[in-house]
């Protein structure tokens, strides 16, 4: 049954305050390296078929890509009937006549793994009314019966957020009302304690909430779907009041508020109280308030019962439901899989496009999480390779995805999961060989999932496309057992997105692509991968120099002491195969050096201490 309201949260593990505790939900296995495989969407959009999927599986084996780690064959949108049958998912009979179990068996017989797609909303992004919302247990049983190894789960038509194709008024669930003030008073006795506090006398915590006139607005989590906002730092805003009461006991909280159903002002309020650390914070109210006539028509709420300690207390007015609701929805599918097959090995790929800042909570339920909207909206079809862009002011480009993912290394790892800047566009129209090589280098250095998105019938062993997607040395960086995403340690950029000087290349969000970046990635054998990237479409010349001291500053103990103390280094260019040797004196003065980078080009080196 499709629910009529967001899930009631009764366990603290789903709460915002638990996002940073490192606890992973049951059934979400960790220790896996980034997934590698093929996904149908960029290649064929909704036009994928059973016949095409079988050919792609055969081509993976024929080309030897399976031996390089490409294991997953994933059906994206367009494979189901448009509506459920007897409450269950079923195959689109023209495109997938044999059914999903037969196709799964075909893929498994070739030593590969089988993946499918769905959505936490009511519908899939292409429109079919078969989203998992309310059907998680039923669908999980189907996926287990079909032998599914990988689930990509999207975020369209989501009921509890203003996501793609969702009702814009769903903003009511994910933002608190505008707040003018509060009153704290003794419970049930006249003449007792009473104190009114203006919102202007509260403190704003986090990011997003702001003062407007005499009230606070924007209490919630800001939308990360698009470019222009950093993924590093606080993603939510709260209004916090400090209240001192004479004695411990039950009090009443009355909130002066006004509602709307737009970004920044909603109807859902969460109230938490604590008299010590935030870990002791108790959510005492978590629901919709009665709507008001407008966002500036303030009224008083009904009294909310709260318990306070004698002395100083903090009262937090907030709305973390954008993140909490989405976590609950993905967790429902994970829990369904746990019930259908305890000990299952299904990999969950969360595709909510960075909307709810999944880098904060995605590790609890998933193996990877998308960080932005799609890398391309011009997908291919049978006979058409589709189009991929190098630069775009929105999300659909290599550099847009890279610019965000490159500063998200702190969120990734074997015990967490992987930032997902979407599928590879190697082989699409618009992507030159140089662009494709650099795109592949970026994704390998950043430990991104390597999901091919091209018609593999266009690839022959030894051709340009093959030599990119089958570069063993680059793949080895992505699949290195240490599982550490590269860190940007140098950039020629002067300004961060929105203005201001670059002060921390590993954390600053930079969107101006007229620059050179250098990424450093420690490897399990004690060596280092160093990647020089030209994000501009124009050639860049100069002495782009990286010294051991700079590497040590950013990587520290992630590299062994022997590396920093080495007398010389063997250096291999992982695209050209060229080998050189650099002495310690040279390295110390900064001569891991590249003097020229082609437009959209890269030089990716593996550096081993002698």
Residue ranges and their predicted role:
Residues 2-50, 335-338, 533:
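N-terminal module-boundary/linker segments of secreted carbohydrate-active enzymes
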Residues 34-40, 69-76, 113-118, 149-154, ...:
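Structural recognition of the beta-strand scaffold that forms the well-ordered cores
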Residues 52-166:
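Aromatic-lined carbohydrate-binding/catalytic grooves of carbohydrate-active enzymes
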Residues 168-324, 540, 551-568, 574, ...:
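Extracytoplasmic
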Residues 192, 218, 222-224, 228, ...:
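Aromatic- and carboxylate-lined catalytic core of secreted/periplasmic carbohydrate-active enzymes
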Residues 256, 443-453, 509-559:
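Carbohydrate-binding surface patches
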Residues 315, 584-610:
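C-terminal beta-strand-rich structural cap/linker in extracellular carbohydrate-active enzymes
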Residues 327-328, 335-455:
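Glycan-recognition surfaces
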């Amino acid at each position: 049954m499709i629910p009529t309201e967001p899930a009631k949260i009764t366990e603290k593990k789903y709460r915002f305050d638990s996002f940073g505790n490192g606890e992973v939900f049951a059934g979400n296995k960790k220790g896996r390296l980034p997934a590698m495989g093929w996904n149908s969407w960029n290649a064929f959009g909704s036009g994928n078929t059973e016949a095409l999927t079988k050919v792609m599986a055969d081509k993976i084996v024929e080309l030897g890509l399976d031996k390089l780690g490409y294991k997953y064959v994933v059906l994206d949108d367009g494979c189901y009937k448009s509506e459920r049958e007897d409450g269950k998912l079923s195959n689109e009979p023209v495109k997938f006549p044999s059914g999903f179990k037969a196709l799964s068996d075909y893929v498994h017989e070739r030593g590969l793994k089988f993946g499918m797609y769905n959505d936490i909303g009511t519908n899939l992004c292409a429109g079919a009314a078969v989203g998992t919302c309310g059907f998680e247990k039923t669908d999980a049983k189907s996926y287990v019966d079909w032998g599914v190894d990988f689930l990509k789960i999207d975020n369209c038509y989501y009921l509890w957020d203003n996501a793609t194709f969702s009702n814009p008024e769903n903003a009511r669930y994910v933002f608190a009302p505008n707040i003018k003030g509060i009153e704290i008073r003794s419970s049930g006795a006249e003449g007792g304690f009473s104190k009114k506090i203006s919102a202007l006398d509260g403190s704003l915590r986090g990011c997003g909430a702001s003062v407007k006139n005499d009230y606070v607005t924007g209490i919630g989590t800001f939308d990360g779907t698009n470019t222009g906002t950093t993924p590093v730092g606080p993603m939510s805003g709260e209004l916090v009041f400090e209240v001192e009461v004479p004695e411990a006991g039950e009090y009443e909280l009355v909130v002066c508020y006004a509602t709307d159903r737009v970004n920044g002002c909603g109807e859902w309020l969460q109230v938490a109280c604590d008299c010590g650390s935030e870990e002791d914070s108790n959510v005492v109210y978590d629901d919709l308030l009665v709507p008001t006539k407008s966002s500036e028509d303030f009224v008083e709420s009904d009294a909310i019962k709260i318990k306070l300690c004698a002395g100083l207390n903090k009262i937090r007015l907030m709305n973390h439901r954008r993140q909490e609701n989405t976590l609950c929805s993905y967790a429902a599918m994970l829990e369904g899989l746990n019930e259908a097959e305890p000990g299952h090995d299904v990999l969950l790929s969360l595709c909510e496009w960075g909307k709810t800042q999944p880098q904060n909570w995605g590790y609890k339920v998933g193996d990877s999480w998308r960080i932005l909207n799609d890398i391309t909206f011009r997908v291919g079809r049978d006979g058409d390779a589709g189009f991929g862009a190098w630069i775009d002011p929105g999300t659909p480009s290599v550099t847009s995805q890279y610019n965000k993912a490159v500063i998200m290394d702190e969120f990734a790892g074997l015990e967490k999961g992987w930032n997902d800047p979407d599928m590879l566009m190697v082989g699409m129209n618009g992507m030159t060989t140089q662009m494709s090589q650099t795109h592949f280098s970026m994704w390998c250095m950043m430990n991104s999932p390597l999901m091919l998105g091209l018609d593999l019938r266009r690839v022959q062993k030894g051709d340009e496309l093959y030599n990119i997607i089958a570069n063993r040395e680059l793949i080895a960086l992505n699949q290195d057992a240490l599982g550490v995403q590269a860190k940007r340690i140098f950039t020629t950029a002067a300004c961060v997105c929105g203005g201001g000087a670059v002060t921390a290349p590993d954390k600053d969000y930079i969107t101006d692509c007229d620059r050179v970046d250098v990424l450093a990635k420690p490897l399990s054998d004690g060596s280092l991968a160093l990647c020089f990237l030209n994000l501009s479409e124009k050639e860049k010349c100069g002495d782009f120099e990286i010294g051991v001291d700079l590497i040590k500053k950013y990587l520290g103990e992630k590299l062994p002491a022997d590396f920093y103390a080495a007398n010389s280094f063997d250096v291999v260019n992982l695209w050209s195969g060229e080998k050189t040797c650099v002495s310690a004196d040279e390295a110390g003065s900064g001569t891991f050096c590249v003097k020229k980078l082609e437009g959209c080009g890269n030089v990716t080196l593996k550096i081993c201490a002698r």
